[in-house]
A protein has these predicted regions:
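Solvent-exposed soluble domains appended to multi-pass membrane proteins
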Residues: 1-162
Length: 162
């Protein structure tokens, strides 16, 4: 081992996934699943987190792990924060998608196209979009993500103001 090894936090992940032969990963949500491994040789026994996490959560997680306590801008959240409602957001083919630990909503910017209990309905065939209220927490969170992202990009404001 090199001297620097003990002072290094290793981040191992994929930038995308390929088509899986496992049917579990062939639905509109789980087809985006990739491994994210944060390895610190000085931390105790590793643990597996079975919670929604996405690539934009890597930076806040790394900053949390190294004890960074200054302001920073991120649409992601540290996986160390257990007090937040963790979600993942994707956009593909004109459809926004947000999921928490059990539900996924699909939204075209105007209306909900799909709502599925992906943990129990892994093929995502039972769509209950018509029963989702307009003030649904996940929908509001998705709309906030979209608004924050678009505002930040248009106004070049994806920074933390002091």
């Amino acid at each position: 081992k090199q001297e620097w090894f003990k002072n290094t936090l290793f981040v191992i992940t994929a930038d995308h996934t390929s088509i899986s032969s496992n049917v579990k990963y062939q639905n509109a949500l789980l087809k985006y699943s990739i491994p994210i491994i944060l390895y610190d040789p000085q931390l105790p026994i590793p643990k597996l987190l079975n919670t929604p996490m996405q690539q934009i959560d890597i930076m806040p997680s790394v900053l949390d792990l190294i004890g960074y306590n200054k302001k920073f801008y991120s649409l992601g959240n540290s996986f160390l924060q257990s007090n937040i409602n963790k979600t993942v957001v994707q956009y593909a083919d004109g459809i926004y998608q947000i999921a928490n630990d059990s539900i996924v909503l699909q939204y075209n910017g105007e209306k909900i196209l799909g709502a599925y209990s992906y943990k129990t309905d892994t093929a995502m065939v039972t769509n209950f979009a018509e029963r989702v209220e307009p003030d649904n927490f996940l929908l509001k969170k998705l709309q906030a993500y979209i608004q924050l992202h678009h505002y930040g990009m248009v106004n070049n404001k994806m920074i933390c103001n002091d």
